[in-house]
Amino acid sequence: MNDKYISAVHFVIDKCKDPYKLGSIKLNKILLFTDGILLMKTNKTLTGDTYIKKQRGPVPKNISAILNKLESENLISIRKGNDNTKLFFSLKEPYIS
């Protein structure tokens, strides 16, 4: 896990002002498309992660560890939504280098 990856996940969560519109699936897709665009333009990805095929789309292999790290550092809060989805709340501004 690199710091840019952790910061990017925190940044996306922070910029989504309505947590009910950003669940795990959308977060994963944002990361996938970001990696895809950067790969085409620079031949590198932001996350450096591999993606695992899941029923609802590709999932970054290390996303759970990233989210747990952000939550343990009190940078985000993760809660369950009404339909058993995950809701992400940013508790502090993300570090942008």
Show which residues each predicted segment covers:
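Domain-edge interaction signal
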Residues: 1-97
